Regions:
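N-terminal "arm"/small-domain region of PLP-dependent enzymes with the aminotransferase-like
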Residues: 1-51, 317-320, 334
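Conserved core of the PLP fold type I
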Residues: 32, 37-174, 179, 185-204, ...
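Conserved core segment of the aminotransferase class I/II
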Residues: 201-270
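Residue-level recognition of strand-loop junctions within catalytic nucleotide-signaling folds
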Residues: 225-226, 258, 301-303, 344-346
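Conserved glycine-rich beta-strand-loop-beta hairpin in the small C-terminal domain of fold type I
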Residues: 270-281, 289-302, 311-316
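Conserved C-terminal alpha-helix-loop-beta "cap" of PLP-dependent enzymes
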Residues: 300-340, 350-354
Length: 376
C-alpha cells in the first residue's frame, strides 16, 4: 500500500477559507469602485506611497518603539529582495556579512549575487554567542550582521533581552549594522524588544507578509536607522524598479491593513497555528532538544549519531517531507543536526497529527538502532 505523503517542507502560514473570502470581497470592491485600476499600472510604486508606508508602520505595531516616522520606511516586493538590497548596499562586494551559523538558505544565494562573503557566528539556544560574535568582528571586520532571532529558522529559538543587549554593544563597538528580520514575531506574545527598539541607530528592520498571510504575497516593510540612511540607499537604487512593490499587490495589502482585514487574517492564523503546534508538542515534547513555537515551524534534533540528511531522508521514505539543517549551513557542515518541519501545509489538524506521529516513529527507530549499534 502506498504511504500517505505530507509535505512539511515549506515555512508557510496555514491556508484559511477567510483568506479566499477576503480576496473575493476585495476584487468585488475594486470592480464597484469609481476609480479605475488601470491608473495604478501607469507608474511605479517607488518604495511605496505614503499610504503604503503608513500601513507598514501600523502592521509593525509596537515591535518598534517609539513609532518610526514614514521618512524611515521603505516598501519592497518581499523580504528576500530587501535582504539583497541591504546586503549589496550596506556590505558591498568583497566585504563580509555575518549571520547565525544556521540561517535561511536563500541568504547564501543572495550574498553570492552581491559578491559578499558570509561568515557564520556560533549560536546556542539563545541565539548568537556574544564571544564568537566579537571574535568574528575582530577577525573579519564585517559591515553588517543578519539576524533572524525571533523564532529563528531553523532552530525556533527566541533571543532573550540580555543576549540582544550584549549583541547590540558589540555591534556598536565595531561599527556593524544589524539587519533584523522579524518574519514570525507577530505570532508570539510577550516578546523581547526588537533590535530596532533597543538600537535604532544601527538597525535595519525587516518585516515581510508572506509568513503571516500567504506565501505568494511579495511585499515587505523596511525601517531604516534614520531618514538620511534610507535616502542614501534610495538614491543608489532609484534607476532600478525590480524591487518596487507591485501596484495591485500594494493596493490590496494596504487596504487590508487599513481596514483591519489583514489583522483578522493574522489572528485566525495564530489560532490555527496554536492548535497545530499543541499537537506537535503533545507528540514530540519529551524528545531532548525539541523546540516548539507559536509560529509556522518547529525544531527537532536528530538522534545521536545521525546527521540531518540521514534523518530527513528516513522521514521522507516514510512519506513525510522535511528540511534538514544541512540546508541552513551553506557550504559548512552544521554543528547542529536536525530538521525544521513547517506546520502550515497539512490540510487539517488530523494530517498534522499523522505527520508528527510518523516523525516520532522514525526518530525512535533511528535512536534505537544507534543504541544497539553503540552497545555492540
Amino acid at each position: 500500500m502506498d504511504r500517505k505523503q505530507v509535505s512539511l517542507m515549506r515555512a508557510t502560514p496555514p491556508h484559511l477559507p477567510a483568506f479566499s473570502e477576503a480576496l473575493q470581497k476585495t476584487w468585488a470592491a475594486f470592480a464597484e469602485s469609481d476609480e479605475t485600476l488601470a491608473g495604478q499600472f501607469r507608474q511605479h510604486r517607488y518604495h511605496g506611497n505614503e499610504e503604503d508606508r503608513a500601513a507598514g508602520v501600523e502592521w509593525i505595531g509596537n515591535r518598534i518603539r517609539p513609532t518610526p516616522g514614514l521618512d524611515r520606511v521603505m516598501v519592497t516586493n518581499g523580504t528576500m529582495n530587501s535582504i539583497l538590497l541591504l546586503t549589496s548596499s550596506l556590505v558591498g562586494p568583497g566585504k563580509v556579512l555575518l549571520t547565525e551559523e544556521l540561517t535561511f538558505p536563500q541568504v547564501y544565494t543572495l550574498a553570492k549575487i552581491a559578491a559578499v562573503e558570509v561568515q557564520g557566528v556560533r549560536i546556542d539556544q539563545q541565539g548568537l554567542l556574544p564571544d564568537d560574535f566579537e571574535r568574528k568582528c575582530k577577525q573579519h571586520a564585517p559591515k553588517a550582521v543578519y539576524v533572524n532571532c525571533t523564532v529563528h529558522s531553523p532552530t525556533a529559538h527566541v533571543m532573550p533581552t540580555e543576549r540582544r543587549r550584549a549583541i547590540t554593544e558589540i555591534a556598536r563597538k565595531y561599527g556593524v549594522q544589524i539587519i533584523e528580520d522579524e518574519a514570525q514575531a507577530l505570532y508570539l506574545d510577550n516578546l523581547p524588544d526588537s533590535f530596532a527598539t533597543m538600537a535604532p541607530d544601527v538597525t535595519w528592520f525587516l518585516m515581510g507578509l508572506s509568513k503571516y498571510l500567504s506565501l505568494g504575497i511579495r511585499m515587505a516593510f523596511v525601517v531604516a536607522p534614520s531618514e538620511r540612511a534610507l535616502v542614501n540607499i534610495l538614491e543608489r537604487l532609484r534607476p532600478i524598479s525590480t524591487w518596487h512593490p507591485a501596484p495591485l499587490m500594494a493596493s490590496v495589502i494596504t487596504s487590508w491593513i487599513r481596514t483591519g482585514v489583514a489583522q483578522t487574517l493574522l489572528e485566525l492564523a495564530r489560532i490555527e497555528l496554536r492548535k497545530r503546534q499543541a499537537i506537535v508538542s503533545e507528540v514530540l515534547s519529551d524528545i531532548d532538544g525539541f523546540q516548539g513555537s507559536p509560529g509556522i515551524h518547529f525544531w527537532l534534533p536528530a538522534p545521536a549519531g545521525v546527521d540531518s540528511e540521514q534523518f530527513s531522508r528516513a522521514i521522507g521514505e516514510a512519506g513525510i517531507l522535511v528540511r534538514p539543517s544541512k540546508l541552513y549551513a551553506g557550504d559548512r557542515e552544521p554543528r547542529f543536526h536536525g530538521i525544521r518541519p513547517g506546520v502550515g501545509d497539512p490540510v487539517d489538524l488530523a494530517e498534522t497529527r499523522y505527520a508528527v506521529e510518523v516523525i516520532r516513529g522514525i526518530y525512535k527507530q533511528l535512536r534505537d538502532r544507534m543504541m544497539i549499534h553503540c552497545s555492540d
